[in-house]
Amino acid sequence: YAYQVYAIALMISSFSLPTAVSKLVSIRLAKRQRRNAFRVFICSLAFAIGVGLFISLTIFLGAGLISTHLMKSPLSVYALRVLAPGLLIVAVMAVIRGYFQGMGTMLPTAISQIIEQVFNAVISIVGASVLFGIGTKAGEKSGKELLGPAYGAAGSTLGTVIGSLSGLLFLLFVI
């Protein structure tokens, strides 16, 4: 259930950013307005940070209400809270990828996507396994038998966030 909320929030925060930034940057560069192309990047980055931060905080702080009342799945609160910072990360990464595309190079984007998916796969599997075990033990102590799967789901969503963060760190290194 947490991924449904994440997907909607992701569309709101960063769905068309790479395309818009790419188009605006390439138009400026075609007119030899390098400084204006960079201004587009900076303004887009500020927008992405603002919107991404707002949506991330809204999801993180409202995870209890969203999971209980909207999704009717109270234990999905853990996965929602793990996914929330990823919205900011992906929004910033979308702008940087769009900037590179507008500059005429897709190599940094391609490499960052590979890095992102490798980290996502590994961390999702390891995180789900480790946190499932921790949640199961905590559930036995507290009498909540579904705590193990809830923690496991949160562990698997950790891969999404760490994967995005690794891709972003690569792009920041390249830029």
Can you say where each PLM-predicted feature lies in the sequence?
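Interfacial/gating helices of multi-pass transporter permease domains
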Residues: Y1-I8, P74-L75, P149-A154
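Small-residue-rich midsections of specific transmembrane alpha-helices
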Residues: A2-V25, I55, P85-V92
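Transmembrane-helix boundary and interhelical linker motifs in polytopic inner-membrane proteins
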Residues: I12-A46, G102-L107
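Selective transmembrane-helix segments that form parts of the transport pathway or gating/packing helices
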Residues: S44-S56
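Short membrane-interface helical motifs at transmembrane helix boundaries
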Residues: F54-P74
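Alpha-helical transmembrane segments of multi-pass membrane proteins
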Residues: L61, K72-I96
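Membrane-interface junctions at transmembrane-helix termini in multi-pass inner-membrane proteins
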Residues: V90-S112
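Hydrophobic alpha-helical transmembrane segments
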Residues: S112-V126, V130-V174
